[in-house]
Amino acid sequence: MRRSAAPSQVLGNVAKKPRFIPPGKSNALCPKIETEETDQDVKLKEIGEKHGNASLFSEMFSENQSENFTQSVESSGKVKSTKAWNSTSKCSKLEMKTQSAPKADAMHLPTSGMAKEAAAQEEPDCLTKYFSVMWCKASKKKHKKWEGDAILITKGKSVILKDMEGKDIGRGTGYKSKELDSLEEGQTLMIGGKEIEVMGVISADDFSSGRCFQAGIATHDTVPTALPQTTMKQFCKPIKSACQPSTKENILLNPQSCKPRHNPNDTNSLVMPRPNASHQCMFNKAGLPVVDVVVDPYIANNLRPHQREGIVFLYECVMGMRVSGRFGAILADEMGLGKTLQCISLVWTLLRQGVYGCKPVLKRALIVTPGSLVKNWKKEFQKWLGSERIKVFTVDQDHKVEEFISSPLYSVMIISYEMLLRSLDQIQAIEFNLLICDEGHRLKNSSIKTTTALTNLSCERRIILTGTPIQNDLQEFYALIEFVNPGVLGSLSTYRKIYEEPIVRSREPSATKEEKDLGEKRAAELTRLTGLFILRRTQEVINKFLPPKKENIIFCQPTALQLELYRKLLSSRVISSCLQGRLENSPHLICIGALKKLCNHPCLLFKALKEKCCDPKSDEHVESSLYEGLTDVFPQDYTSDTFSEIDSGKLQVLVKLLAAIRELSSSERVVLVSNYTQTLNVLLETCKCYGYSYTRLDGNTPVSQRQQIVDSFNSKFSPAFIFLLSSKAGGVGLNLVGASHLILYDIDWNPATDIQAMARVWRDGQKCTVHIYRLLTTGTIEEKIYQRQISKQDLSGAVVDLSKTSEHIHFSVEELRNLFTLHENSSCVTHDLLECDCMGNKDHQNPSSKKPSVSRCCQLRQDQGKHNSKKPLSMSQLMQWKHFSGQHQALPDPFLERIKENVSFIFQNVTNATSPTQ
């Protein structure tokens, strides 16, 4: 505190210096008045010492309180009260008493219980308040040059100043709490080297949710009360020709001639919502007649309710009706809900119709998809619209972008992400009115070439389609939103400060109650904002249209060779060093890969072992030391080419399961999925060995042939019994309803990979009961990976985490110790974790004891409630499934009955048990 502001220093009377009093306003024009005020304060202190009662000060202080004062700021940053200048002496007296009396009270009262109690009553409650302010650098200029808006937070005697990006730009302490509590609009305050002026009060709810930082972001324009009437032009003679062109002038003169393309009053018609007055004021300045936009009945009659809702949602987004000035949308429906059909309906409608004067909204549309889905999109256009209504151009090796430019016949271009980068210069020269990105979650990294290229396109109307929206990685979530609606959430730094950091901090175990509350409110506000242009529905909306689905988690007993090799690997020096925390160069990932190969088949491990022995110059020293001594465990005559199913527990189960399907349902077919090409080679040899006809699609399959392979397999005349599928190459977007059995041979760290692969068969067009089998080796790393999957998501697959987990995961030493443990004495570690006492004889499903939470579209998956159970919520849902031990006398499922000798445990869940099937 600066003594230079004391009254005695201001008066220059150093010889007769009174006891120090906290500074008040000094006025060089009124020295006599200030001297009187100082003497008055000394008298007040003497009275206080004599009576020892704080109430006397309160009475004397309250008598001189003024009702008419305004706030001003001294250069020291203290708030002061300035009386309206009716009287100079009154002003000075009131001002000095207002500021110095409470301090004198605190300094000179005796420390009696009554005094302490009175002081406690006068102590402020330290309530936190929020204000919207303007700020600038401190100066003595009369006309300030304000540099920007900010948020002022006051609590007790301290203040924090945040800019509109959430960054702290100023802090201060030592202010008078009563003066901070009385801040009002128009008052000023010094904070550090900055001067602020209060603009208004912000509610605590607006600050907690982050709405106060959204200045101008995602707000709707004010709706005018009435639209101005269009000035009609002077009458002119009509054109004699019967074919009068529909120019803007003719439409204005004869608005009755502009009618909807289809009848909006039909019973099953799908009519788009009309724009409100604000939208018309912005986009219909010419005053064209507003016409109903009706989806072609040729399509509308085949749409399901959720698809009709999706088309309306997309229409409102791309027309700018949901968020002012933004024309993007994210359709995040689960796989199989018809995202392709909804987009085709939207494109066809906007290519032929428009809400203002019947003028079509689109001239050209660009659809970017993975290479394996280019022909599938073209096929869907032909399926729903035929080849006469619309011409679709697909870019491939034989059809270049130049042909699309030179031909007026095509209004829709379909191109793969890879081909887009090759033809980027030609694409940028074309004016597209709508951009659709299928499997758009690959755009979650804003720095990759594909995202940069698409962002640079001039098209404002953008739609992302993804069946697996990102939920946990908020920066990737921001990248998708920024692509479709740039700037709707502000800059990346603003997003991090306002949303990401509070939300992530609230999920940490050490988070305080305030941090958790703030994180929940920020997450709710982020959900509200993004809900304006993100729509997500789960597969539950079409379950009633699909046949029953039986999902089986099968735990396969490992063979003696697998157990011996597994023990040998776990005792290696590499794994021991991992468990001691030596994780340089990620040796634990090599160990995990070796254990996964062993679970699939020992021959895969043997092949890797031989490759390292034949290549001593290899820099994979860690892998070579991991395989040390494994050769002695394999039989002497063992080779990777002469493998047998007797060496792998999962392969034994697979062989028996395929035989049971062939015998019991000879007309049904199987999709066999693996994450690895080497494993697919083993499965292919197994098919050859048992004479099963097959077809295969993996990363080596040419993109131009993939759709033909899928169509051939789906045909009822297909001779193939098994479809060998690589989940990494073709597990996304393919429709394999020609099969009713799907076997997932191995497991991936990323649950989305497995869920997408399993969704290939249970979707629209499927007529038979669907059987899904997930094979896991009991007690091994595969069971641990499965537990890790279901601890992050619901078993129904409603929402998945698409953060790039893969195998580049950070593990703690404790997690690695759990992964590198072989449980030989348990029939199912997962069932043991459930603490279920059914003894593997639970042949019924329990109804959910908890009401399922209703979640909004693309809701951030924060924990909605707290539970004391150590089991994750999704893990506990396994209690609702059927539990079967391998020792079960008679399994109700005939396919499972054939394989139970090689199985230790089974979880089964049946969906749509009452649906009619063939």
From Swiss-Prot:
EC number: 3.6.4.-
Pfam families: Helicase_C, SNF2-rel_dom
Motif position, DEGH box: 438-441
GO-annotated cellular components: nucleus
Gene giving rise to this polypeptide: RAD54B
Entries under SMART domains matching the protein: DEXDc, HELICc
MF-aspect GO terms: ATP binding; DNA binding; DNA translocase activity; helicase activity; hydrolase activity
Positions of the Helicase C-terminal domain: 653-817
Region (Disordered): 1-29, 842-873
Keywords (A to Z) from UniProt: ATP-binding, DNA damage, DNA repair, DNA-binding, Helicase, Hydrolase, Nucleotide-binding, Nucleus
Protein name in the entry: DNA repair and recombination protein RAD54B
